[in-house]
């Protein structure tokens, strides 16, 4: 089953450096949208400058990272896991945020790191994790894509609260 979590990035440079290490990715499981690995910090800052100018603000650069982990029993190839990560990023971010998707294959636990800019460059708005982009919605989109690829699922019944704690989410993934 696919487990997903999201967190704020403290240092974009460090997150990117960690994510794109050759021994973790074999150098070819990397996709970007509206940015490049080599200039990601500058690319994200350019969107931030446009946001600050349009909104008369002086915000600092902020970004987030989604970690999407796959169950080894789903027998995904690294390429398929990467394609799923890119599809997820496209659907969740709706073409409005710059992103980097990197698939790590150095362990039995294939997983994606999806680093994205908090700036919606299309509308000059900030990523809103409290309304449209809630953790619940993140998991629902992940679930839809997992179903599309016949990946095993975590039980999220309709009677569940809108929010379940990450520990409970992981416990359900393990079936405990």
Predicted regions span which residues?
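N-terminal nicking endonuclease/strand-transfer module with a His-rich metal-binding environment
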Residues: 1-176
